[in-house]
């Protein structure tokens, strides 16, 4: 992400949060309901670049229009006021690429990408920036992720991961890995699990 800081835009955020009622102020300019930003150093319209105004980041497209409610470069997201979001979850409907789902944008505004990420002491897994849920196989190990995306641990009664017929008891260790094809002593009791991880009675 290429970011530039324009000191002349220090008051622009006040305009945006006030409903953008003013048509022009400092280096921001509203034209036909769209916002543009002119570089205070040379007066040129900013295109395909980021603008920082009072510690908030805004993205201007190839026409110089400030973007709102948009995913930028499949990495950042700007809200209804055009501000890049940070440290928050956002559900993005990206049906064009079949990648709709929850994403988490970190302190630098970037969406978490592939792999395990810990957020507020909870483990989540992402594939192509989208939060995974349900049964997943990662590096040859089987895990289950709750509807919230949180990694499952301990005992859990779930639909069969292979044929989806009925519900069975499964056990996931402290690392979230499914126990299967063997036996394990849990709280003093020995349990046997089949090849798919179902507890056998």
Question: How does the language model describe each region?
Answer:
Residues 2-201:
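Extracellular adhesion/carbohydrate-binding repeat motifs centered on closely spaced tryptophans
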């Amino acid at each position: 992400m290429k970011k530039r800081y324009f000191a002349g835009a220090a008051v622009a955020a006040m305009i945006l949060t006030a409903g953008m009622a003013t048509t022009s102020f400092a280096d921001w300019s509203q034209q036909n309901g769209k916002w543009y930003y002119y570089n205070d150093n040379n007066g040129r319209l900013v295109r395909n670049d980021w603008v920082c105004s009072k510690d908030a980041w805004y993205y201007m497209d190839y026409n110089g229009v400030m973007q709102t409610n948009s995913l930028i470069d499949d990495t950042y997201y700007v809200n209804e006021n055009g501000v890049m979001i940070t440290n928050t979850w956002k559900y993005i409907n990206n049906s064009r690429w079949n990648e709709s789902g929850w994403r988490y944008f970190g302190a630098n505004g970037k969406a978490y990408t592939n792999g395990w990420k810990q957020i507020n002491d909870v483990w989540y897994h992402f594939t192509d920036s989208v939060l995974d849920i349900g049964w997943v196989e990662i590096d040859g190990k089987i895990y289950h992720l709750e509807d919230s995306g949180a990694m499952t641990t301990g005992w859990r009664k779930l639909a069969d991961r292979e044929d989806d017929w009925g519900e069975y008891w499964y056990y996931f260790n402290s690392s979230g890995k499914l126990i299967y094809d063997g036996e394990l002593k849990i709280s003093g009791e020995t349990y046997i699990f089949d090849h798919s991880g179902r507890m056998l009675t």
